[in-house]
């Protein structure tokens, strides 16, 4: 298999976001923490990339989106690839309540030819729900 890792976050466009590094599940992007006091030493600038800008004309066959609540933004940054290549997708739906409904609709709008499957695997924690797009 041909794959590579990139030291960047998945997003809708190429940018830099401020991230609060608290460790584990308490880490987040700054906009989701407005109004709460933040230790400046925990703020990190993170390079964010859209998949479309990164892969250009490469053919993509599989994408896994498990980006801790930023799945919608990551899908927005992959519109061209999804329309052009119809890669198989695995999209996490459990980070934000609205994603259970909004993300299947978004995927179908990007490429109506997908068949969608919801699966809840026996993971710990037990609320992990995934959308498979074939």
Residue spans for each PLM region:
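Phosphate/nucleotide-binding beta-alpha loop and adjacent structural elements of enzyme active sites
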Residues: 1-134
